[in-house]
Amino acid sequence: MDRDEIKSAIEAILFAWSDPLSIKDLSEVLDIGTKEIEGVLAEMINEFNYSKRGIQIIKMNDYYQLSTRPEHYEYLQKLFAPKQNRGITQAALETLAIIAYKQPITKTEIEEIRGVKCDKAISTLLEKELIEEQGRLEKTGRPIIYGTTINFLKVFSISSLDNLPNVSDFNISVDSDILKDIYEK
């Protein structure tokens, strides 16, 4: 890979992962030495800053993450401001069902089941206090694990997760692999 391809790959990895990644993790994924990764990241940080892009690469100890630039906070705040009386989308409902049946579960595992990104759905569910962060996995990147809340039980009038209906009881026509993924524990 040439240097531009390495930069492109690092940007894609940091974007897709969303949590901080170490140089060691990037080195293993790209099969490139840590010193070269470190040099490329330093160049990328300078390039992102010089071109005043909307995103930046931030360094936290030996970890790196993509982040929006602080000067765009007011725009993002408007975008993500809680909206009153907003319903729940089909995507959020699907995400909630997966979390309810598979918890504790990571965002990546949810996305593998759904086949699409779920950032907005998770954000909505957190905002409505139907799910919560229940910690982090002790593996590379330390991904957040999600589970349902007491509010989830209250909203859906169930006393415990043991009272969730069996997925096989639903008369739904979905890809049987998806149904199997959700139901298998």
Swiss-Prot record:
Keyword Cell cycle assigned: yes
User: Where is the protein localized?
Assistant: Cytoplasm
- Give me the disulphide-bonded residues: none
- Give GO cellular component annotations, separated by semicolons: cytoplasm
Q: What keywords is this UniProt entry annotated with?
A: Cell cycle, Cell division, Chromosome partition, Cytoplasm
Classify the source by domain of life.
Answer: Bacteria
Which GO terms fall under biological process for this protein? cell division; chromosome separation; DNA replication
* Record-linked InterPro entries: ScpB_csome_segregation, WH-like_DNA-bd_sf, WH_DNA-bd_sf
Give the UniProt family note: Belongs to the ScpB family.
Q: What does this protein do?
A: Participates in chromosomal partition during cell division. May act via the formation of a condensin-like complex containing Smc and ScpA that pull DNA away from mid-cell into both cell halves.
Q: Indicate the quaternary assembly.
A: Homodimer. Homodimerization may be required to stabilize the binding of ScpA to the Smc head domains. Component of a cohesin-like complex composed of ScpA, ScpB and the Smc homodimer, in which ScpA and ScpB bind to the head domain of Smc. The presence of the three proteins is required for the association of the complex with DNA.
Recorded protein name is Segregation and condensation protein B
Q: Which organism is it from?
A: Alkaliphilus oremlandii (strain OhILAs) (Clostridium oremlandii (strain OhILAs))
